[in-house]
């Protein structure tokens, strides 16, 4: 702006969203610069279970009723001395179940975040490619076809027709047991622009594989992300069996936890960024309260607490949305301007 050029430096820019975004980034940098690392140690025990070939790796927990953080090497050495030559035995076994719900279909903001994390797309690139997919792709025999719905939306609402089509597709291709019991909604109580529904494929039968030959590599990757997320949003939760074991060593306790997926649900189609498709599926089935345990070794490692992470495009978009600053459609140009002007 001319005023900013006159008062500070020519070529600078400011704006309601841009200025707040820069303040958020600057505050985070101050936090990082002021951060003082704190030392702590972890301790693992490799434990042989009689009758089992593979040893367990148990993590130090603390005492029977209290979790302990090991702050120094001196504390570590005292604990290691106390657990070196004592009997190890199973103190407690807890079995249970947990579920993980399917994600909601994409809004503009969540698409930008996930594309940044999964595809390493800048927000501006995500919006540019989404615009291409919305405006239309030349598909042989069909002409120019828009393959996704409008890309600027705050809503996770899905039309009844699209919801029914997705459920029918899931039932036919995965089985009725994979179809979600109820439509997923998360708009209640939020200020949203609901003129447009969530970002979704315009036709669920137009699978990524079916249109791949008509798309560029980046168009295909983004379309596949949108298609999978939408289908997953209409599917049942994933279900897991869990086992948690507490192992006693004198006054101290070590823990081992494992989970096994027993019903894939939506994860047969989609896993979010940061997830692993296969979790630890060893259910510790050979372990019971009478199992004979032998400690094979103790392994310790020094760590230091880490400062808050620098903002990425994905985390900055998430923060702006959570604070209610700007609209998702403004995030891409705002972040592009911040980067282009080398403010960060």
Indicate residue ranges for each PLM-predicted region:
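A short local loop/turn or secondary-structure capping micro-motif enriched for an aromatic residue
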Residues: 65-67, 158, 263-266
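Phosphate-backbone binding and catalysis cores of DNA-processing enzymes
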Residues: 1-97, 200-253, 260
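Generic detector of intrinsically disordered, low-complexity, polar/charged segments
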Residues: 12, 59-62, 143, 262, ...
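Polybasic, glycine- and aromatic-enriched phosphate-binding surface used to engage nucleic acids
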Residues: 252-284
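Intrinsically disordered, low-complexity sequence elements enriched in Ser/Thr/Gly/Pro
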Residues: 14, 188-189, 265
